[in-house]
């Protein structure tokens, strides 16, 4: 079954929603974003998060020491690097599960996968607005050219209305959603519920 990551949790309500709906992963954003949380906030959230839901930290071009501090204090299960990090940088985190985001404009971007040894690639849409969380989708057909030595986490513009089609086309390890389960910029319980049910109903 395809796994679900709900990204950008930033309120206690979001944690309560996750505890009820049990996504496989939840994401805390530590980069510049309207969904950004700091370590103090995240520590409070983690205290209230049910066991079994894996914690992902999202980072963009952060100093190694800062990432390590956050990862160790929160006991993060996955480090998601969404910026211009190199393999040399990623090698600092050999004791962690690492997902590397690749922003997709064309098939040429898939060549970047050859530069990394990571646990999964998160394919996201490219946007001039910034790194991730844009709510924009890309042409999933591009991923037909990807040779699947490393699992795929599909991101970018996913929502209840298109996630089934995306899964059937890409067959990812996991799907990642943020703005697609929000109303007015905040996580919405019913949208989260519908999205998770839709994903888990795909055969």
From Swiss-Prot:
Its EC number is 5.3.1.24. It comes from the Bacteria. Disulfide bonds: none annotated. Keywords: Amino-acid biosynthesis, Aromatic amino acid biosynthesis, Isomerase, Tryptophan biosynthesis. One of its GO terms (molecular function) is phosphoribosylanthranilate isomerase activity. CDD domains: PRAI. The keyword Ribonucleoprotein does not apply. GO terms for biological process: L-tryptophan biosynthetic process. It is an enzyme of class 5 (isomerase). It catalyses: N-(5-phospho-beta-D-ribosyl)anthranilate = 1-(2-carboxyphenylamino)-1-deoxy-D-ribulose 5-phosphate. Pfam families: PRAI. Pathway: Amino-acid biosynthesis; L-tryptophan biosynthesis; L-tryptophan from chorismate: step 3/5. InterPro entries: Aldolase_TIM, PRAI_dom, RibuloseP-bd_barrel, TrpF_fam. Belongs to the TrpF family. PANTHER family: N-(5'-PHOSPHORIBOSYL)ANTHRANILATE ISOMERASE. This is N-(5'-phosphoribosyl)anthranilate isomerase.
